[in-house]
Amino acid sequence: MKKKVSFGESIIILVILLLILETAVIKFGLSPEVPVLFTVLLLTFWAKIRGFSWQDIQNGIKEGISVAIIPIFIFILIGALIGLWIQAGIIPSIMVLGFHLINGEFFLPSVFVVCSIVGVAIGSGFTTISTVGIALFGIGASMNANPALVAGAIISGAVFGDKMSPLSDSTNLSSAVAESELFAHIKNMMWSTIPSFVVSFILFWILGSSGQMDLTKIERTSSILQQHLVISWWAIVPIILMLICAWRKIPAIPTLFINIAATVIMIFIINPHFSITALNNLIMNGFVAKTSDSSVNSLLTRGGISSMMGTVALIISTLSLGGMLMKFNIVQSAMEPLVKYLKKPGCLITVTILSGICINLFVGEQYLSVILPGRAFKSAYDKIGLAPLALSRVLEDGGSVINYLIPWGVAGSFAASTLGVPVLAFLPFTFFSLLSPVFSIISGVTGIGLKWSKKPTK
């Protein structure tokens, strides 16, 4: 017979599911799609034994997937745009420019800073990674840089930009859930963001300065790009167009459609004989490089709607699992009893961050990792006198920035698919995401930068 899931039962279920996923992905090195589907199967068996109907199970899956319909469509458009940007010479032009401007010793910190600036301007980590990030990744490959290190710098910068931009969905969501004013929220995040940024920059500088540039390979790659693709200052037009759309607060889907249309026009201007059939194949299957250098071919052969299908499959599977966990109140049952025991700010902030990390692990969706802890712990923050700004900062530091570190998470799977580097490879080098929750906890324990709505009673 169906009944309320107890705290103990919910913890046991979550631990078992996490052990299965971690063993499969980390110990055996399996891609996460099949292990996630297996956990969905196990949870389905448990639900039937506990008296849940097939309708309950289907509703859980449906509700879980529904939160990702828009992101999935955005991923499809980004896949199309990547192939188009390479064909139009946009990404190759950025690479050639980067070869001339970026010093090898400062390459990694430069990547981190550039992606941070672009991320703040655009307000989207996904767009930053899939556009400028790909170009910078290509430059890194030509310099013989460690791909995982370059990916870590790109993602760290993109996460910083996504976190600090007033145009970012996750930033606006955290502010709204905690009921704090947006720009006050961004300002308050500096207490954890600036230390994380500075330490990340130093680490990238130290690690980047230890490598050696292969000048011959850089010159050869630059020459091949200029021989086989159009390198032009006109490549900046779609980038400027994207920035204009961002600052005019045009949503992601119309922004991507506008950019796709502009890039298609550029392609036909560059090559009037480019056929509709070739355009269709480019959008569907991505750009296929056919140069004399196999490493350049591997670097530029990417994009297309089909390149995102593996990511889409993983997202649907993960959010099906997350939807069932939510529908059966497993996640809620594990969180709710904690609230009444959290009376010190350090403990409350630490548990809030850990809750966000756990929801990222179990549900795989960054928005829910902000919403659920926000709803569960808001009353506890009010009770001990912490301001909404304290909660909104913690929701960002333990929620949205962590999703990029989860192999089966929406953001993590997207970054891995787009850059071609597994999550577990770039995870140790995504310093900004790793440090943000640490500095947030330090702030909570020490009281430095902690905002109060009323003075705590001693």
Segments predicted by a language model, with ranges:
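Hydrophobic transmembrane alpha-helices that form the pore/transport pathway of multi-pass ion
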Residues: N103-W191, S355-D397, K458
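Hydrophobic transmembrane alpha-helices of multi-pass small-molecule transporters
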Residues: M1-I70, T193-V199, G208-L314, K455-K458
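Transmembrane-helix bundle segments that line or gate the permeation/cavity pathway
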Residues: A153-I154, V159-D162, P166-L167, F197-M213, ...
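Membrane-embedded alpha-helical segments and adjacent helix-loop junctions characteristic
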Residues: G51-A141, S292-K378
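Short juxtamembrane and helix-loop transition motifs at transmembrane-helix boundaries
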Residues: M1-K3, I86-V96, V113-I117, Q212-Q226, ...
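Short, amphipathic, aromatic/basic-enriched membrane-interface segments that mark the entry/exit
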Residues: M1-E9, G98-N103, G119-G125, S222-I231, ...
